[in-house]
């Protein structure tokens, strides 16, 4: 896997919820769903290069999958990795596209 490919596969999508919206307003922390292979340094490099911002710190946690039933079939949701990315002062990522 080339370095450009790894950057694009590291950050999967932003994780948007009421809690993450509050974090982004209060202390410029953006939450991303990231690849399971990614570590803090991978996430930092990917966010800095893809969004052209300065990253101050990265915290990562693993979210366990939950048991779910689909009718009579037992299954579950997949486990995934979440990254809290704190941006340096004066930097911002705008996902909406409005200026």
Curated annotation (Swiss-Prot):
A Gene Ontology term for the protein's cellular component: ribonucleoprotein complex
Keywords per UniProt: Ribonucleoprotein, Ribosomal protein, RNA-binding, rRNA-binding
Keyword Hydrolase: no
InterPro entries: Nucleotide-bd_a/b_plait_sf, Ribosomal_uL23-like, Ribosomal_uL23/eL15/eS24_sf, Ribosomal_uL23_CS
Keyword rRNA-binding attributed: yes
GO MF terms, alphabetically ordered: rRNA binding; structural constituent of ribosome
A UniProt-annotated Pfam family: Ribosomal_L23
Biological processes per GO annotation: translation
PANTHER family (UniProt xref): 60S RIBOSOMAL PROTEIN L23A
Protein family per UniProt: Belongs to the universal ribosomal protein uL23 family.
Biological role stated in the UniProt entry: One of the early assembly proteins it binds 23S rRNA. One of the proteins that surrounds the polypeptide exit tunnel on the outside of the ribosome. Forms the main docking site for trigger factor binding to the ribosome.
Assembly description: Part of the 50S ribosomal subunit. Contacts protein L29, and trigger factor when it is bound to the ribosome.
Name of the protein described by the UniProt record: Large ribosomal subunit protein uL23
